Amino acid sequence: MTATKTAALTLLALVAFASNSLLTRLALGTHQIDAASFTAIRLVAGAVMLLALAAAQDRSWSVMQGRGVAGPLALFAYAAPFSFAYLRIGAAVGALVLFGVVQLTMIGYGIARGERPGAMIWLGLVLAAAGLALLTVPSVTRPDPLGVLLMAIAGVAWAVYTLVGRGTANPIAANARSFFWSAPLALVLVLVVIGLHPEAAPSARGIVLALVSGAVTSGLGYAIWYRALPSLTVTQAAVAQLSVPVIAALGAVAVLGEAVSSRLVVAGVLVLSGVGLVLSARARQPRVERSTRA
């Protein structure tokens, strides 16, 4: 693959990942759909897209072969809090919290597994953690605490999902299976919400936004990312993901009309700088885990 094509595919995938935050906030922030229905439609649409791509790749439906409940459970544990968080916080804040928590969880997992971080990695961890903590300090501009907590839970779950799927021979098929088997969990959640709030009725616009989030920015976005990934070094792939919260923030301002506070800017600089330091230090180590964005 040429360098130009790799760059184009990488940029397209990163924009897709950032767009998940924008689409979810656009749908839920304007009350076009309830969070449970958005989650269910997103997972079902993602499953259909990924299954079609995987089947076309293998020219069979053998992609559904495979066991394990950890992937579907982790995916659902990410998708549901992700949606409910965007009832309370903006896309820019949500993308930053998600990115920061995913990276910190992955790094923490490495340390728990025996990695011995040097001074540069510890400095990066402190900076990133400080940036996330800054978002929770009480003030007039503080994001909704419950929304931040829900997104943090989503971040931990996505990190677990990434760790469960690492080293998979066919990542598109593995993602397809996880989306397929997580969808019933989301449908149960919908039934619970309907039981509690029978008046909830998704609008056509809300349904379309959920379908696009599932089929295009999730399903197709992952496929594009995995197409570009073999042509990227581990460091290039990791550093490229630093742009996702920035793209989401720019989109939140341009598309959603969100105001970016000085608190968010400072928190963003701390988180991205901290993660950047960690990635720079880990690039010199023999083994570095790859992760994917939501």
Describe every region a protein language model picked out.
Residues 31-77, 101-109, 157-161, 178-194, ...:
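Transmembrane alpha-helices of multi-pass small-molecule transport proteins
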Residues 1-15, 46-70, 113-122, 140-146, ...:
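Membrane-interface interhelical linkers
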Residues 50, 54, 75, 117-137, ...:
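Hydrophobic transmembrane alpha-helices of multi-pass small-molecule transport proteins
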Residues 94-101, 165-184, 218-254:
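Helix-helix packing/entry segments at the starts of transmembrane helices
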Residues 37-48, 75-76, 83-116, 154, ...:
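Specific alpha-helical transmembrane segments that line the substrate/conduction pathway
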Residues 1-40, 73, 77-81, 130, ...:
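Glycine-/small-residue-enriched transmembrane alpha-helix faces in small-molecule transporters
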Residues 27, 38, 42, 85, ...:
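Hydrophobic/aromatic residues within transmembrane alpha-helices
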Residues 16, 57-99, 107, 127-134, ...:
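Specific transmembrane alpha-helical segments of multi-pass solute transporters/efflux pumps
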